[in-house]
Amino acid sequence: MLDLAFRNVAILDGTGTPAFTGDVGVEGGRIAAVGEAGAAQTDIDGAGMCLAPGFIDTHAHDDGAFLRYPDMTFKLAQGVTSVVSGNCGFSAVPADPAVDSARASGGILAGLESGVTDLASYFDVVLARKPAINNMMLVGHNTVRAITMGMDKRAPTQAELAAMGDHVTAALEQGACGFSSGLIYRPGRYSDTEEVATLAAAAAPFDALYTTHMRNEGDRLLEAVDESLAIARTADVHLHISHHKSAGKANWGKVGDSLAKVDTALRAGQRVTLDVYPYTAGSGRMIEYFNLDRINLALAEVIRIASCPAFREFEGKMVPDIAQELGLTLEETVLKILTAEKGDRTICIQFVIDERDVETNLAHTDMMVGSDGIPDLKGKPHPRLFGTFPRVLARYVRERGVLTLPEAVRRMTSLSARTFGMQERGEVREGWHADLVLFDPATVNDEATYDDPKREPSGVAAVVVNGELAWTSRDGKGIHMGAGSGKMLRYRNNAHGESSTK
């Protein structure tokens, strides 16, 4: 007898082909039947709803969240069953007890424990928490640089470069799916192209990825794309461009030129993919966006405070409104926030992206979806943390028709699984891991807003992680089932396979 069966569902198998009606059966953590399914211990009637592979968040910062919030409600409620963490050059590993890696990340890695030193120990600690969803890891440039040479603004010595390379290789040997950089952030911004290419080349023997938050996403976007392509060519690795955008009103429309460069590289045989979040605002460490000697007033005008340990009362407010309340200029307000104790850990939201660019991005066939959510639940985070995947289905499929439903599901499932080496995931296929999401295509919607960013989405009826019912709903209210069935995923070309909670 099957453990679980979905009956009378519109099956979107993740390949981009049209939906077909049938049943899907689950047994022993795997998909046991597609089309017709026999008797099951638990039946779920999915008439009028779609069953798809669980969504894959290709751009997460959940390294520490798996320890602080192992229930991972903000992802599970969206139908996300797997994430890729360690992005933007910040990763949980390697870790050195003598170095505060949270300092380099501005608190993004908060929650890590002293027992974590490498990927294997990190996976062990996370699995002990019984995580709700699956996690795959990148190893971050900023992290290995901070551990090796601190926050020094200089080129590494040959010995330091070799030490960084050893850290990257060690993580890849233990199953990391690639090497990530965040070249807008310290200390990564102090590196030159050659340094990054040398470290990215460590991924080549593993056929792993180089993912990048590029050096510039605004005025010098096109030059940054050229650099990223050159790094990947030199290193002979697959390039994945994170949260592709052209920030700042003067740069709106440049995503078309940027994507043209990507297409040229693809035609030349280079391996390139991208991801995007479906919002017109970004979010990150506020300190990284300002030169304190010369405050960018135009940028300050469009910034909202998401998390501010120094001034919790500022959270959820725009900088101009804070300035008015305090009787300060914009410049004085920014300096007050950023120079306060723990001011460098302030997370802000910047309204700098054009809606038409979001649509242009989503229309590109190699574009995946990554939330880029920063899981700080104390403040008012960017709503993408809770809403990214339902927003794609509601706004860009149902309302705007930018993507067909089968194509949107492909971008959020099989394309992501294949790119990041998640073995036997990302499709509704017999014998594959049973990561599944049941949703109503007519009502699925992101409910999170900038004013109320922690609202769970609507229209997600059930989520299965590794064969166990992890999320369901009753009377429109989501219910976390506490399954704790998530696994730590190792890259497809790593002989060790997966780390399981079982």
Stretches found by the model and what they are:
Residues 94-115, 122-123, 142-156, 167, ...:
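Polyanionic/metal-chelating signatures
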